[in-house]
């Protein structure tokens, strides 16, 4: 059994350090070390050895993925549903025209914080919190936003600062 994560604690830390994080990531964008991708991947792996997502699942409880057509097709097929039926049951279109869940938390999140469609989950879920992508400095605003929701994203930025500054 994994140790429960104090989501509010990490949220408060992220709020307190938001300006510092923004400045650090902004500087990183201006002058990134040549081996940044390697450093970032190592830190990503280190963070996810410490953080068990199933002890948190805050992303699944509070952030909804933006569904792409490939996601909808894959998940509807998994449930043996026609696309319109899947969309009618689970999705709505937001003010930006994106397809998102009708309700949160995620309807596929179990009481044990496990995803019931893990193998076919949306791309946005698969890639969250995006800390293992190359050229991390290209998504600074998203990274800052993710630190407010995801303890692993917060730790990633903190460890990256320690390593680079």
Give the label of every model feature segment.
Residues 1-165:
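Short loop/turn segments that flank or connect secondary-structure elements
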């Amino acid at each position: 059994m994994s140790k429960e994560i104090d989501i509010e604690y990490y949220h408060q830390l992220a709020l307190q350090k938001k300006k510092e994080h923004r400045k650090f990531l902004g500087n990183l964008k201006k002058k990134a070390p040549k081996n940044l991708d390697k450093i970032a991947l190592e830190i990503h792996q280190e963070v996810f050895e410490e953080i068990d997502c199933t002890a948190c699942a805050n992303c699944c409880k509070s952030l909804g993925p933006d569904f792409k057509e490939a996601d909808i097709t894959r998940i509807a097929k998994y449930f043996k549903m026609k696309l319109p039926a899947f969309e009618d049951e689970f999705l709505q279109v937001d003010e930006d025209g994106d397809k998102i869940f009708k309700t949160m938390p995620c309807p596929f999140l179990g009481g044990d914080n496990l995803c019931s469609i893990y193998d076919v989950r949306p791309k946005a879920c698969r890639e969250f919190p995006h800390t293992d992508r190359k050229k991390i400095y290209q998504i600074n605003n998203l990274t800052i936003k993710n630190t407010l929701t995801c303890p692993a994203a917060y730790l990633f930025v903190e460890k990256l600062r320690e390593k680079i500054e």
